[in-house]
Amino acid sequence: LSKLPGEIVSANAYMGVEGILKALDMGADVVITGRVADPAIFMAPAIHAFGWSLEDWDKLGKGTMMGHLLECGGQVTGGYFAEPGKKDVPGLGHLGFPIAEIAEDGSFFLTKVPEAGGMVTVETCSEQIVYEIHDPENYLTPDVVANFKQVSFTELEKDKVKVEGAAGKPKTETFKCSIGYKDCFIGDGEISYGGTGCVARGKLALEILRERLELVAPGVFDELKFDLIGCNSLYWSSDCQYNQEPSEVRVRVAGRAKTRTEADIIGNEVEALYTNGPAGGCGAVKHTRDIVSVASILVSRYDVKPEAELFTV
């Protein structure tokens, strides 16, 4: 922690089911938590309802599998899945969230209400299972080390998928803890160019901005990024990869600086392109924001004591 470049402003340990169980045991109808691992939100009610032991690792592995599939809501009912003509999803404008029906032995299936949009299929479940898990045989959570290696999906009927094969191993002695610290300021500016020659005018705008920032703020920015949105903002190629020139592009420049005043320079220079840059610039915007960055450490689980308080409203 002493090596972090800025002032620490937050520390949030990823807790498990313990605090949620305390709240449920107190009779809570709604539980509001601090930072907990996503699967714990869904697994805790199952533990509470069925009286599972917190050392029944296979049941906890199954519960974690359920929570992992549910944690991002509409992602398992077709959100973040659709690709027209290849993976079509009906009703994304009224996408339904998933429902898990779980039995005491930890077996469960996923579904959704029939009138809601989206779909629950083997394919949507298969994409969600690999989301953010790193090693499927050792998915580390505060409550269990889950093993998803043998998980299988079976479509029982339309929008109803059975999930089997999850297991678990004893939990680790540590919690992940996210440390927030004051890092820098980021300034950015954008301006659009459209019509014939828009790519050439966008490139000229970027050349002007490079020259201006070197002139008015030499050595100020720790990092600078120059994008021509519509050509190279996602893949960082040096040129537009089109057989035909696009009808519009958007120039974007962003940079990291140590002070807000320095970061403001970028947006001001982009805005100046209205009158001092290529023809036809429009829609300029600028922003400056202070950045709280995140570093991750491990802390002893025994140093973190969840508490619960019951309110009646």
Short names for language-model regions:
Residues R35-I41, K258-R260:
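Gly/Ser/Thr-rich loops at beta-strand to alpha-helix junctions
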Residues M15-G19, M26, L60-T64, V120, ...:
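Conserved active-site and cofactor/substrate-binding residues in soluble primary-metabolism enzymes
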Residues E164-V313:
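C-terminal non-catalytic interaction/assembly regions of soluble proteins
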Residues P45-D56:
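A glycine- and small-aliphatic-rich helix-loop capping segment at beta-alpha/alpha-beta transitions
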Residues L1-T33:
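An acidic, phosphate/nucleotide-engaging active-site surface
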Residues L60-P170, I186:
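A conserved active-site cap/scaffold subdomain adjacent to cofactor or substrate pockets
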